[in-house]
Amino acid sequence: MTNLRKTHPLMKIVNSSFIDLPAPSNISSWWNFGSLLGVCLIIQILTGLFLAMHYTSDTMTAFSSVTHICRDVNYGWLIRYLHANGASMFFICLFLHVGRGLYYGSYMFLKTWNIGVLLLFAVMATAFMGYVLPWGQMSFWGATVITNLLSAIPYIGSDLVEWIWGGFSVDKATLTRFFAFHFILPFIIAALAGVHLPFLHETGSNNPSGLSSDADKIPFHPYYTIKDILGVLLLILALTSLVLFSPDLLGDPDKYTPANPLNTPPHIKPEWYFLFAYAILRSIPNKLGGVLALVLSILILAEVPFLHTSKQRSMMFRPFSQCLFWILVADLLTLTWMGGQPVEHPFIIMGQLASILYFLLILVMMPITSLFENNLLKW
């Protein structure tokens, strides 16, 4: 009798995706982050659901409802901090997942890569709206500053901002709609992830060498299920350690001051995972130019497959490209640090130089270096 998992209409989908899936025998731990992102999404949806049961999206009561969750709800503090720090873990896994894709040439799977870029935008939008919900000082002013950027769009900008606000400033209407979108977007992300996977399984996974692994495949279960479970346990260990020992390590003290439209915080800044993009935005003195640079800093990922000039897929055997890749990583870390600094000398010029280097590396230096490496190998 044929195994039920191979014949049942629903179970055979799971079987072909997670059990009998042929996987390359040499994929490293860098391939764990896809499953970790799935776990992060589940954690966020579950903790978010329980938070939504107690949260009120009204400007008068939003801040006190979050306080109520932390003080009066059973393990409310744990749920709230798991959700807040879970977002940080989500972005750590996301950045490592994208970095792995760039290093090993996974972007050559065009459909999978483009849906991944869409997913990145969706997660960033969700995180931004979630940052507004506690209605602290940084929530209010962050929402005001970031939504105001849309006014840089010629002709329709001002109308668009007021349409998003639902009035003439960030107020109750804005908070209510942000809560609605923050609630629905994770399910859209889950649906997109459900499209991301079949496109990946259509081609099969890439591997560190960048060569075809058709000649040497192994079943996903038990080899990679065990490997993924280890990754999940390490993720949970890191998340619980952060939540239980230092829950506010990655947050901003201004979150604990109720929103006050009459008092601007000295330094308005987003959460740490947006600081690199925020630094790029601030480095351009022109408003429209800054907004374009901000969008392009992420959208540039969609261009990467078209900038691939090397005859080899992976960077595993390309030392010069490896050097540039790690310079890019260092540059992004520098931009992240710069985004959290006040707008004054020397941070202004440093931010501008780091922003120029970011675009130069991806658009010019990496493609030229790849051609140089081809030449060295007489290809």
Curated annotation (Swiss-Prot):
GO terms for cellular component: mitochondrial inner membrane; respiratory chain complex III. The chain crosses the membrane at residues 33-53, 77-98, 113-133, 178-198, 226-246, 288-308, 320-340, 347-367. The gene is MT-CYB. GO terms for molecular function: metal ion binding; ubiquinol-cytochrome-c reductase activity. It is a multi-pass membrane protein. One of its GO terms (biological process) is mitochondrial electron transport, ubiquinol to cytochrome c. It comes from Sorex minutissimus. Component of the ubiquinol-cytochrome c reductase complex (complex III or cytochrome b-c1 complex) that is part of the mitochondrial respiratory chain. The b-c1 complex mediates electron transfer from ubiquinol to cytochrome c. Contributes to the generation of a proton gradient across the mitochondrial membrane that is then used for ATP synthesis. Its main location: mitochondrion. CDD domains: cytochrome_b_C, Cytochrome_b_N. This is Cytochrome b. Binds 2 heme b groups non-covalently. It holds the Pfam family Cytochrom_B_C. Keywords: Electron transport, Heme, Iron, Membrane, Metal-binding, Mitochondrion, Mitochondrion inner membrane, Respiratory chain, Transmembrane, Transmembrane helix, Transport, Ubiquinone. SUPFAM superfamilies: a domain/subunit of cytochrome bc1 complex (Ubiquinol-cytochrome c reductase), Transmembrane di-heme cytochromes. Heme b b566 binds at H97, H196. Its cofactor is heme b. The cytochrome bc1 complex contains 11 subunits: 3 respiratory subunits (MT-CYB, CYC1 and UQCRFS1), 2 core proteins (UQCRC1 and UQCRC2) and 6 low-molecular weight proteins (UQCRH/QCR6, UQCRB/QCR7, UQCRQ/QCR8, UQCR10/QCR9, UQCR11/QCR10 and a cleavage product of UQCRFS1). This cytochrome bc1 complex then forms a dimer. Heme b b562 binds at H83, H182. A ubiquinone binds at H201. Heme 1 (or BL or b562) is low-potential and absorbs at about 562 nm, and heme 2 (or BH or b566) is high-potential and absorbs at about 566 nm. Belongs to the cytochrome b family.
